Amino acid sequence: MSEERFVSGHRRPEDARIEETLRPQRLADYPGQERVKEQLSIYIAAAKKRGEPLDHVLLYGPPGLGKTTLAHIIAHEMGVNLRITSGPAISHQGDLAAILTQLSEGDVLFVDEIHRLNRLVEETLYPAMEDFALDIILGKGPAARTLRLDLPRFTLIGATTRYGALTSPLRDRFGVVLQLQFYSEEELTRILMRAARILNVPLDPGGAREIARRSRGTPRVANRLLRRLRDYAQVRADGVITRDVADAGLRMMGVDAMGLDTVDHKVLLTIIHHYGGGPVGLDTIAAATSEEPETIEDVYEPYLMQIGFLQRTPRGRVATRAAYEYLNIPYTDHPDEPEGPVQPRLF
């Protein structure tokens, strides 16, 4: 869709520049994700004591939760270089070979969207991950032979929003697998206050809490809303982002009290009004909302499920009683919806 979406967790070009400015360098300065940080701190300390590279790491979860930032921190804590690429950027085996042969001992290679690697490239990656070796096929047909090149020991960090899309052989080659969770309002409030100090944005605690409440548990969304509200406060208020200023600005941007925007409403209303609340298939929802099925599944559904507005069932997606109540629509019982009340709360 062409409509600007303030609450999407996907990175925009303008996000990258700000995120570089706000990015912490140490695990101790990284807010939230306490379980992930505790595990990583142990694994990093142990690897450094042994004088070895860190085991390969797989980070998965919705977009905007800090997977790239963690890759930067891991490289910094290990005292090594970081090389960044993405699954779609490695289109041929030669591309991967060029990247791997340029790594130094202990370096970190971060592959974003690793689920989008093509199969041939992925298979070339297996011996590199397991044996730190690269198999190159010379010649064709019966005369073809394989030349094995030794690689420096390195750490591969893969990031994905679609854990289930990874093949089992690839998943099994990661020694460390960590899932990133949505952030609490308290954690997002701390993130916003820190960002405001760095960016010199006048933000009071009430304004920070209001932004955090509507940021869908996602730091990237919170920081993006902070920047847009800075503009709103400078033009429509005295420059300070208070709770009232944040509320007015977010309403102007179409972000409601639960952090939902017009796209979220369209998804829910499509299920309710066009398909009787469900169950309805993913492709059908995508066609009705003019969105890609992968976008519905990766961007919209995780948050709608987290707050209890949407359920996945064997027969399709179902809008919950909580969604009906929030949208002020009379509820009709659905046999596919799990029994028991679902509260519209993030945490």
Swiss-Prot record:
InterPro entries: AAA+_ATPase, AAA_lid_4, DNA_helicase_Holl-junc_RuvB, P-loop_NTPase, RuvB-like_N, RuvB_C, WH-like_DNA-bd_sf, WH_DNA-bd_sf. Coiled coil: none annotated. The keyword Hydrolase applies. Its main location: cytoplasm. It catalyses: ATP + H2O = ADP + phosphate + H(+). Residues 1-183 are annotated as: Large ATPase domain (RuvB-L). GO terms for molecular function: ATP binding; ATP hydrolysis activity; four-way junction DNA binding; four-way junction helicase activity. One of its GO terms (biological process) is DNA recombination. Its EC number is 3.6.4.-. It is an enzyme of class 3 (hydrolase). Residues 257-347 are annotated as: Head domain (RuvB-H). Mg(2+) binds at T68. DNA binds at R312, R317. GO terms for cellular component: cytoplasm; Holliday junction resolvase complex. The keyword Aminoacyl-tRNA synthetase does not apply. Residues 184-254 are annotated as: Small ATPAse domain (RuvB-S). HAMAP family: DNA_HJ_migration_RuvB (MF_00016). Belongs to the RuvB family. PANTHER family: HOLLIDAY JUNCTION BRANCH MIGRATION COMPLEX SUBUNIT RUVB, PTHR42848. This is Holliday junction branch migration complex subunit RuvB. It comes from Symbiobacterium thermophilum (strain DSM 24528 / JCM 14929 / IAM 14863 / T). The gene is ruvB.
